[in-house]
């Protein structure tokens, strides 16, 4: 038996019944970004691939519209 117990990852979007991820919802998007501004992979967050693709598109749109910075060198 392993020493450490890993908590099961679950998809937050599936649990809350969210149909589509909005690029204007900055608080949700920031939960899936690292300190440096990189998108956290689904194997770490437990997000389903459908929502991970939507999340990636939403983050890229928000970056393009200057709602979220590309790197950590800029203030949020």
From Swiss-Prot:
Cysteine pairings via disulfide bonds: none
One GO term (biological process): translation
Keyword Ligase found: no
Keywords: Ribonucleoprotein, Ribosomal protein, RNA-binding, rRNA-binding
Listed GO CC annotations: cytosolic small ribosomal subunit
InterPro entries: Ribosomal_bS18, Ribosomal_bS18_CS, Ribosomal_bS18_sf
GO MF annotation list: small ribosomal subunit rRNA binding; structural constituent of ribosome
Residue ranges of the TM segments: none
Family label: Belongs to the bacterial ribosomal protein bS18 family.
Subunit structure: Part of the 30S ribosomal subunit. Forms a tight heterodimer with protein bS6.
PANTHER family: 30S RIBOSOMAL PROTEIN S18 (PTHR13479), SMALL RIBOSOMAL SUBUNIT PROTEIN BS18M (PTHR13479:SF40)
Purpose of the protein: Binds as a heterodimer with protein bS6 to the central domain of the 16S rRNA, where it helps stabilize the platform of the 30S subunit.
Stated name of the protein: Small ribosomal subunit protein bS18
């Amino acid at each position: 038996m392993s020493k450490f117990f890993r908590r099961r990852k679950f998809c937050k979007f599936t649990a809350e019944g969210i149909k589509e991820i909005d690029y204007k919802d900055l608080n949700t998007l920031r939960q899936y970004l690292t300190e440096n501004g990189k998108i956290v992979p689904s194997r770490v967050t437990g997000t389903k691939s459908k929502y991970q693709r939507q999340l990636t598109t939403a983050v890229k749109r928000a970056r393009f519209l200057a709602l979220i910075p590309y790197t950590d060198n800029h203030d949020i």
